[in-house]
């Protein structure tokens, strides 16, 4: 799936998570949840799907960021 197709199929909540992640290169689950005004469980579910699709990655300290491939539209 290409980046445009992934974005087209995202829910409003997932788009909100992606938007916040663009402005915060390394963000914790709690910070992301608070910024998006979503429950931590919902945010974690969305972020894990993003990890599976190669949109996001989890860093060594439990912080999340968008992958360079996704940011550059290579996926």
Give residue spans per PLM region.
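Residue-level "edge-of-site" marker
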Residues: 45-46, 63
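Short amphipathic alpha-helical interface segments
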Residues: 10-38, 45
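Basic amphipathic alpha-helical segments that dock to polyanions
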Residues: 49-50
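Intrinsic disorder/low-complexity segments enriched in polar/small residues
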Residues: 41, 45, 70-72
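Glycine-centered, phosphate/nucleic-acid-interacting loop/turn motifs that mediate DNA/RNA or nucleotide
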Residues: 54
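Short, cationic-aromatic polyanion-contact patches
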Residues: 3-14, 28, 58-75
